[in-house]
């Protein structure tokens, strides 16, 4: 098999630890959400996303109710585009004040840099908003890696467990789906990408999944425990 013409990667559980997102980013956004909405709720960009939350609830509600709803969605790990956008805005403050830096596995950072040097275009597809993705890579504990990525995709392109989303990405980057390798730790996402025609590899990191996924669960996806084990 020839080397892929492009590599598309997830973030959480793939390039980076699940615990960083769950234990650092989510709690930070939850704590900061009330003050952020009260202070910036009048800004058009922030209000746009708050209105989407209100539409989801189906009521004309005060901001205090929206704040409670957003905090509940964080607790539930809801993949709502408005929540992800607002979280990204809050995290931007955290990155810029150096409250934290984004975790990137060393093997992922090294391999992403190597692929970029070899001329393989790299793309990111995550449930986090595109601005949040860019901040994540720009403020990683391996340095600014944002320049390695050719383009970014979030749930505005479609849900990650639907094959149509991966077809749209292939169309947008102008690479045939069979020439794209998608990396993720979520089997349902890999299944969707494979249905769209992409090559797939499951990141089954022991740090995130102490019990390896079974062969039946992995199916036809390549299974690796780090980027260094990937066969292109």
From Swiss-Prot:
Coiled coil: none annotated. It holds the Pfam family Hydrolase. This is Enolase-phosphatase E1. The gene is mtnC. Pathway: Amino-acid biosynthesis; L-methionine biosynthesis via salvage pathway; L-methionine from S-methyl-5-thio-alpha-D-ribose 1-phosphate: step 3/6; Amino-acid biosynthesis; L-methionine biosynthesis via salvage pathway; L-methionine from S-methyl-5-thio-alpha-D-ribose 1-phosphate: step 4/6. Its EC number is 3.1.3.77. One of its GO terms (molecular function) is 2,3-diketo-5-methylthiopentyl-1-phosphate enolase activity. Bifunctional enzyme that catalyzes the enolization of 2,3-diketo-5-methylthiopentyl-1-phosphate (DK-MTP-1-P) into the intermediate 2-hydroxy-3-keto-5-methylthiopentenyl-1-phosphate (HK-MTPenyl-1-P), which is then dephosphorylated to form the acireductone 1,2-dihydroxy-3-keto-5-methylthiopentene (DHK-MTPene). Belongs to the HAD-like hydrolase superfamily. MasA/MtnC family.
